[in-house]
Swiss-Prot record:
Pfam family, any one: GST_N
Lineage: Eukaryota, Metazoa, Chordata, Craniata, Vertebrata
Organism of derivation: Oryctolagus cuniculus
Alphabetized PANTHER family for the sequence: GLUTATHIONE S-TRANSFERASE (PTHR11571), GLUTATHIONE S-TRANSFERASE A1 (PTHR11571:SF107)
PROSITE patterns named among the record's database cross-references: GST_CTER, GST_NTER
Residues forming coiled coils: none
Keywords of this entry: Acetylation, Cytoplasm, Transferase
Protein name in UniProt: Glutathione S-transferase alpha I
Modification N6-succinyllysine, positions: 4
Family under the similarity heading: Belongs to the GST superfamily. Alpha family.
Highest taxon above the source species: Eukaryota
Amino acid sequence: MARKPLLHYFNGRGRMESIRWLLAAAGEEFDEKFMETAEDLDKLRNDGSLMYQQVPMVEIDGMKLVQTRAILNYVANKHNLYGKDMKERALIDMYTEGVADLYELVLLLPLCPPEQKDAKVDFIKEKIRTRYFPAFEKVLKSHGQDYLVGNRLSKADILLVELLYNVEELDPSAIASFPLLKALKTRISSLPTVKKFLQPGSQRKPPMDEKNLEKAKKIFKIP
């Protein structure tokens, strides 16, 4: 029996959460080995497991993969979530890069100095309302299909829906004016594998709180 993928990261969302989402949606079970201290990260670096001295790192199918996008692309290819031809893959990449741009803003928000946080939140909300959500809504409207690309599930749908959940934690009303995004969120959330991942007790991680933020800062030696 093949080994399950083993995910090396800290016990929080960060840059691993999208990988958790994609594996879960694909129905591929995985194990996790959490770093608890800076020494745990140093050990991975010193034993040569991290090509660029960085995590996330996933042991999968005999490889030690790093770089979030490379890992996501491998999982998507493995589970037929990456389109049927070059044109579809180009669209999927274009949409997921847009998702990644907004995701990065949300991901780094906890590290924002307190005196700058309100302004940063307002900036993110403005980008959501005027740039990113209208763009994805327009794609869905343009073809009238259930999924972003090729009328079949792809990594673009899964990663966009993960982002929708994250944005709703920041602004519960953000999706209200985008009916097709709301419908996509409901559709993807109803898939048995995703529905299971959204249940309490799954490997999905909660929003970053102060305790986990301080722990992450110590592990990654962030001032």
